[in-house]
Curated annotation (Swiss-Prot):
Single GO cellular component term: S-layer
UniProt keywords, alphabetically: Cell membrane, Cell wall, Cell wall biogenesis/degradation, Glycoprotein, Lipoprotein, Membrane, S-layer, Secreted, Signal, Transmembrane, Transmembrane helix
Transmembrane spans: 838-858
Function, in words: S-layer protein. The S-layer is a paracrystalline mono-layered assembly of proteins which coat the surface of the cell.
Entry-linked Pfam families: PGF-CTERM
Designated name of the protein: Cell surface glycoprotein
PTM notes: Glycosylated. Cleaved by the archaeosortase ArtA at the C-terminus, with removal of a short hydrophobic segment.
Protein's cellular compartments: Secreted, Cell wall, S-layer; Cell membrane
Composition bias type Basic and acidic residues, residue spans: 206-220
Length: 862
């Protein structure tokens, strides 16, 4: 290499070094002069301040700053607490599931949120907080500050609307608005109001970046907003999207809403259905009206149900949804037009219409009609134009305006719907009813029927039936009504009287609204057949029968033991709640008590004490007070009272048993005009007795002794124990029973198979705890009682003897087979040999063997 070449290379190297230093200086200077994204904890003005002049998220961040997932192009230097600094991409997560991971740069959209520092755990270390960017609220408000998000925005008179936003990333980026029409065409620039910007920020409100959320005219709970003029675009549905201007346009950082822009000034009324069952609620919506408007909906008096009261007519429009007021308009006693609430409706002399005042909220006014107060016909409902303070005051109908008769007020829309008559059924009682008995009263009702009344008819009008001291029954939410354990004849009204006598009648159910013919708010005691049938009603035939009485006393072998002195009784008494049970002995002593009848019309009473009676013949009586619930001709009106009369009066003194029984009968079933019922039985009260009636004997030592007997003791309360005793009265085995029927017959089995019993004479003893009885039994050797086989059975083996003989020739017929299968004859021959024995049989076998050998020799010669 020449000196000249070396010099040229040195010059080039110098130029490169100088250029590199210059470039580095320029780069460093550029970084130092870059716009600051913010100074973290001291940050106050936002990315659109005069110091930065940028709207996106590029720039430096300082210690303590909040950064967001998805941010790109951000830088910063952070002290590590040891005198050094690190870049943003070297910060580490302080805690949590992902502790220690690095904060990547650019920041991924799914980077775990939390605190990141240069040197976690070291005092003086610096860092940032990572959050998820979010728009937490997006609301479209009309010029009256009504929320029309997702509904209708009226475009009229160049009134502007606002798109208001709450979000958390104002330190990172501005918000950007995008508006598209229903064809997907972007119309953002067109719909923006004059002077409005398509980008905003919470912290800025100036000519370049106006923020209507900060101008004091809007709800200051919003961070930022955009001003639009709906009159700038055509009618239709528009999609509004708000998101960050650069990086933060994903997930929760972006929010979308729709709005229907219309220029139509006429509101419309839509009904949920054009046909409802009377009593069913009918919902409606008012649409195409600016947010915050108030409209009147009206149903005229001619559409009302005839039997309802004024206070109910005032409830035609339900106080639900967006309804701010409801009531009636008519004339008072002085002839003045007045609007009254339901509570004052009865003060009207005449009624013109029912009204509801409904507010447009969220683009729609929602209301509902209570159709149970309307006639079952075609009903007209009118929607009046929005009130501008002319017919409303404080969102209520003013007092001296009649919308129907005053031509000043026009309707925006009207609709009609059909009201169909509802249905009622009465499912119980049905068929037959025993007077005085308790039954369930139940049935079904159409939706909207709140209460029903029960009526009964003989030949004339329908008479009200009192149900458990009430005149009506409420309908449950599942459209059924039900009352349990009701005595239809037990009330004080005309219908109860009808059902208290045997016969065939009509029982019916009617909507309470149709049972108030004079509209006084209470059901009528009586309805004509026409009045009953013209309402929502249903009726069935019901046959009423008289009370009955059946019963029996439980005795054992016709007796009750004086050791027990207790007796049971059971039976059926339809239509009764209580009965009298009485006992009279031959000496005139009496025991009487009252018992209750169960809901299923049965009665059962155990362990009635009869210890006051003498032994001997006893008569037992079950007495019912009958249909009129009176014993005799008013002798007593209660079972307990009549029982006391029997014990304390009829059985007092020196009366005989017959005299006591006579007094019971003459004051009950035999009294004048009495409808009492009685059941009579007789038994013997005697000493306790348990006897052994039969024992099978003799019995083998491994057999079973069967013991049977009778008793007059009560089972369950007593146990009969049976023992086998040896000749020294030592117990060999024992068993017991506490079950026997009313005939007193009992039985016990003593199993000897597990007992080591020697043959001999033994005793069986039965003991009921108070009484015993014995019988002897002989035990013999096991197997000694087996019967010998009959002589006619002996020949049976002989009849089978010829069978081997008939089978014997079979080997001979098979003998030629050895030509093809030699072993088979040998097997057959051996079988025959084992089967047959006797003199000369061995010689025959030898002969057969010789013949077989000869045949084999001949075969070989051939």
């Amino acid at each position: 290499m020449t000196d000249t070449q070396q010099k040229i290379k040195a010059v080039l190297l110098t130029v490169l070094m100088v250029t590199s230093v210059f470039a580095a200086t320029i780069a460093f200077s550029g970084a130092a002069a870059a716009s600051e994204r913010g100074a973290g904890d001291s940050y106050t003005t936002g990315p659109t301040d005069g110091n930065q002049d940028n709207v996106d998220s590029a720039g430096n961040v300082g210690a303590g700053a909040v950064v967001f997932q998805g941010e790109d192009d951000i830088e910063g230097e952070f002290a590590d607490g040891n005198g050094d600094t690190v870049g943003i991409g070297e910060l580490q997560k302080v805690s949590g599931d992902n502790e220690g991971i690095l904060l990547e740069s650019p920041i991924p959209q799914d980077q775990p949120t939390g605190r990141y520092t240069a040197n976690p755990g070291v005092e003086g270390t610096e860092g940032v907080t990572l959050q998820t960017p979010r728009i937490t609220d997006l609301e479209i408000q009309n010029s009256d500050e009504g929320d029309v998000t997702g509904s209708i925005l009226q475009a009229n008179n160049d009134n502007t609307a606002e798109i208001l936003v709450d979000y958390n990333y104002d330190e990172a980026e501005d918000l950007e608005l995008t508006v598209e029409d229903e064809d997907g065409l972007e119309v953002t620039e067109e719909i923006l109001a004059d002077g409005a910007s398509e980008t905003v920020n919470t912290n800025v409100n100036n000519d370049d970046h106006p923020n209507p959320a900060a101008d004091g005219d809007r709800d200051d709970s919003f961070d930022a907003g955009f001003t639009i003029n709906p009159s700038n675009v055509d009618e239709g549905e528009y999609t509004i999207t708000v998101e960050g201007v650069e990086d933060l346009d994903f997930g929760d950082a972006s929010e979308t809403a729709t709005v229907e822009i219309t220029t139509d000034q006429t509101a419309s009324l839509s009904l949920d259905s054009d046909e409802v069952t009377q009593g069913e609620d009918l919902g409606f919506d008012i649409e195409n009206s600016p947010e915050g408007n108030f409209h009147a909906v009206v149903i005229e008096e001619s559409e009302f149900r005839d039997s309802a009261s004024a206070s109910n007519y005032a409830k035609v429009f339900r106080n639900v949804g967006d309804t701010s007021d409801r009531g009636l308009v008519g004339e008072d006693a002085d002839g003045n037009t007045v609007a009254v609430a339901p509570g004052d409706a009865d003060s009207l002399e005449s009624i013109d219409y029912a009204y509801g005042i409904v507010e447009i909220d969220g683009g729609t006014g929602v209301g509902s009609v209570e159709t149970q107060y309307l006639d079952d016909s075609s009903i007209d409902i009118d929607l009046y134009e929005a009130a501008n303070g002319d017919y409303t005051d404080n969102n209520a109908h003013v007092n001296d305006i009649n919308l129907v008769t005053d031509d000043t007020y026009e309707t925006d829309d009207e609709q009609d719907f059909d009201v169909l008559e509802g249905d009622l059924t009465i499912d119980s009682p049905s068929g037959t009813y025993v007077t005085g008995s308790e039954v369930d009263v139940n049935g079904t009702a159409s939706e909207g029927i709140d209460d029903v009344a029960i009526y009964a008819r003989d030949n004339n009008d329908y008479e009200l039936v009192e149900i458990d001291s009430e005149e009506t029954i409420s309908v449950d939410g599942d459209d059924t009504f039900s009352e349990e354990d009701i005595s239809l004849s037990g009330g004080d009204l005309g219908g109860n009287d009808i059902l208290g006598l045997p016969g065939t009648y009509r029982i019916g159910v009617v909507d309470v609204e149709d049972a108030d013919s004079n509209s006084n708010g209470t059901v009528d005691d009586s309805l004509t057949t026409s009045e009953f049938n013209s309402g929502v009603s249903s009726a069935e035939s019901l046959r009423v029968t008289d009370t009955e009485l059946n019963g029996t006393f439980i005795t054992y072998n016709g007796q009750i033991s004086s050791d027990d002195n207790q007796i049971d009784v059971e039976g059926q008494a339809p239509g009764k709640d209580n009965l009298v049970i009485a006992f009279v002995d031959s000496r005139g002593n009496a025991v009487a008590t009252d018992i209750s009848v169960d809901d299923d019309d049965t009665f059962s009473e155990d362990d009635i004490s009869i210890s006051a009676l003498s032994e001997g013949t006893v008569t037992a009586h079950i007495i019912s007070s009958g249909r009129d619930n009176l014993f005799g001709d008013g002798v007593s009106d209660s079972s307990s009272g009549f029982a006391s009369l029997i014990e304390e009066e009829y059985a007092s003194g020196s009366s005989t048993g017959d005299q006591v029984r006579s007094r019971i009968l003459e004051n009950s079933v035999d009294d004048t005009a009495s409808d009492d019922l009685i059941v009579n039985e007789q038994f013997r009260l005697a000493d306790g007795l348990t006897t052994v009636e039969s024992v099978n004997s003799p019995v083998e030592a491994n057999g079973t002794i069967e013991i049977e007997g009778t008793t007059n003791r009560k089972p369950d309360d007593n146990t009969i124990t049976v023992e086998l005793l040896d000749d020294e009265d030592e117990s060999v085995t024992v068993d017991s029973t506490d079950e026997w029927s009313s005939d007193g017959q009992w039985s016990v089995s003593l199993d000897l198979s597990d007992e080591n019993v020697e043959p001999g004479n033994f005793t069986v003893e039965a003991d009921d705890g108070d009484n015993t009885d014995r019988q002897s039994v002989q035990i013999v050797e096991a197997g000694s009682l087996e019967e010998e086989q009959p002589a006619t059975d002996t020949p049976e083996p002989d009849t089978d003897t010829p069978e081997p003989a008939t089978d014997t020739p079979e080997p001979a017929t098979d003998t030629p087979e050895p030509d093809t299968d030699t072993p088979e004859p040998d097997t057959e021959t051996e079988e025959a040999t084992t089967e047959a024995t006797g003199p000369g049989f061995t010689a025959a076998i030898a002969l057969i063997a010789l013949v077989a050998a000869a045949l084999l020799a001949v075969r070989r010669d051939n």
